[in-house]
């Protein structure tokens, strides 16, 4: 198992949920946590614990974003007009690594970040190697010509178990995607329930 896969499944085990809907997730095989004490009855979480868990799950889903960076994203969501939970999700889904993942150019969000960081992606014809780069509606994201034959890309396109959401248009023959619009929370195909309103409560304590 690769280090990237190990990190991904570690998050699943920590959350006790298959947060990416992956068939190989260890939580599909058991309903309790890892380790010798995993089968003990879970204690009821406090309000703080529920809020913390919601934050960890949302952070984890997008590749275990570092706390400092995630807090900065939340701060921007709070400053923007409109509903803060909706703004938060919109900002997360506007990340370049998230769009590369949603477009099914790679199998996981972890792979998407690495793929971008290694310089395999262009935005509007310009190479961008920052996973957190924020895309705007109308931006065209494409896999570099020399990168289209990478095994990771080919397997993702051929074996993907996810549908491309309607706020992204993807051409898998050309490996080009367009970020059509910033989605609402209800548009995002999370395999599990995400509760960004609890993230707002956590940071508003």
UniProtKB/Swiss-Prot annotation:
Record flagged with keyword Nuclease? no
Q: Which GO terms describe its cellular component?
A: small ribosomal subunit
Q: Does the keyword Magnesium apply?
A: no
Please give the PROSITE patterns that the UniProt record associates with this protein.
Answer: RIBOSOMAL_S4, S4
InterPro entries associated with the record: Ribosomal_uS4, Ribosomal_uS4_bac-type, Ribosomal_uS4_CS, Ribosomal_uS4_N, S4_RNA-bd, S4_RNA-bd_sf
Q: Which residues are in the S4 RNA-binding domain?
A: 94-157
Q: What SMART domains does the entry give? A: Ribosomal_S4 (SM01390), S4 (SM00363)
Which GO molecular function entries does the Swiss-Prot or TrEMBL record give?
rRNA binding; structural constituent of ribosome
Q: Which HAMAP family match?
A: Ribosomal_uS4_B
> What is the name listed in the Swiss-Prot or TrEMBL entry for this protein?
Small ribosomal subunit protein uS4
> Which species expresses this protein natively?
Rhizobium meliloti (strain 1021)
Print the organism lineage: Bacteria, Pseudomonadati, Pseudomonadota, Alphaproteobacteria, Hyphomicrobiales
- Its gene is rpsD
């Amino acid at each position: 198992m690769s280090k990237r896969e190990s990190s991904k499944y570690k998050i699943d085990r920590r959350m006790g949920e298959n947060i990416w809907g992956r068939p190989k997730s260890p939580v599909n095989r058991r309903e309790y946590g890892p380790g010798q004490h995993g089968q003990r009855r879970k204690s009821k979480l406090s309000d703080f614990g529920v809020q913390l868990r919601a934050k960890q799950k949302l952070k984890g889903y997008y590749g275990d974003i570092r706390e400092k960076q995630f807090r900065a994203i939340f701060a921007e969501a709070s400053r923007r007009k409109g509903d803060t939970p909706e703004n938060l999700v919109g900002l997360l889904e506007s990340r370049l690594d998230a769009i590369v993942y949603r477009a099914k150019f790679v199998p996981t969000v972890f792979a998407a970040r690495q793929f971008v960081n290694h310089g395999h992606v262009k935005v509007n014809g310009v190479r961008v190697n920052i996973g957190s780069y924020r895309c705007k509606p109308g931006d065209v994201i494409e896999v570099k010509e020399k990168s289209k034959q990478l095994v990771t890309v080919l397997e993702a396109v051929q074996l993907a178990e996810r549908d491309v959401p309607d706020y992204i248009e993807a051409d898998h023959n050309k490996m080009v995607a367009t970020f059509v619009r910033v989605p609402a929370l209800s548009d995002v195909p999370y395999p599990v329930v995400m509760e960004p309103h609890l993230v707002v409560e956590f940071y508003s304590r």
